[in-house]
Amino acid sequence: IDQKNLEIASKGLEESGVPVLAERLDVADEKQWQHVAKKASERFRKVHMVVNNAGVGGDSVSVDNQEKKGWQWTLDVNLMGVVYGAKTIVPLIKGHGEGGWIVNVASMAGMGGFLHGGAYNATKAAVVALSESWAEELTSQNINVSVLCPAFVKTRIYDSERNRPKEYKSQISGSESSNSFRRKTKKMIDNGIEVSIVGKRVVEALSNGELYIFTHPNYRSEIQKRFKAIDDAFKDSEKSIALKESPDK
């Protein structure tokens, strides 16, 4: 999508001696995935890994102000982009029989949602669930799956509006309330960790065969609160009068 930065990244890798194939890709377009997969196979012969990294912030609004176009954009990029990536690349990995890896980039929001982030939260939770499912499905074929769940990282996701296609434009996109939220988000992201640190953490985690990859251990206590609430809810169900007659309780 960002041709200029794609060229900069490609040049940097080539100068360090890394073979590169730089292709623009709209991850929400399955046909473009197929095109890139074909080009990658021709360039490298064998493909061993796909990193589903593309993501957008989407609209940040209350539940009663959400619009279909905003939801659709977030779903198509954050969720269907991951689905198309795996659907397209897994057959290539299976084809050579040497095993490989799927790395899906979710978010801490996939472990516990934040206020007014309905569409974003939903897609990231879905990516976590997909990763868990695929990890179990593909392990027998020596294909590993990991899901990266970072908190704030110094990226431009707060400015993903710049890449929103016109067919996904909503009344909310570009509004003052939306811009205000982006400005607040930018401040938090600017104080996040460097992308290079995340990259090193991912390499470390893959070497260890980790399914869940976390980059912000200070969020552990917040996630523990959620899982404690879930555990407490199970305890409540054990005391349920309504469930006493259920054979599956």
Regions found by a protein language model. Name each.
Residues 107:
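Residue(s) in the substrate-gating loop at a strand-loop-helix junction
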Residues 61-63, 67-72:
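Substrate-binding pocket helix/loop in short-chain dehydrogenase/reductase
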Residues 112-118:
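Active-site loop immediately N-terminal to the catalytic Tyr-X3-Lys motif
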Residues 3-4, 24-35, 68:
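The beta1-alpha1 cofactor-binding region of Rossmann-like NAD(H)/NADP(H)-dependent oxidoreductases
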Residues 140-213:
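SDR active-site lid
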Residues 86, 123:
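Active-site helix of classical SDR
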Residues 112, 133-143:
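Active-site-adjacent segment of SDR/Rossmann-fold oxidoreductases
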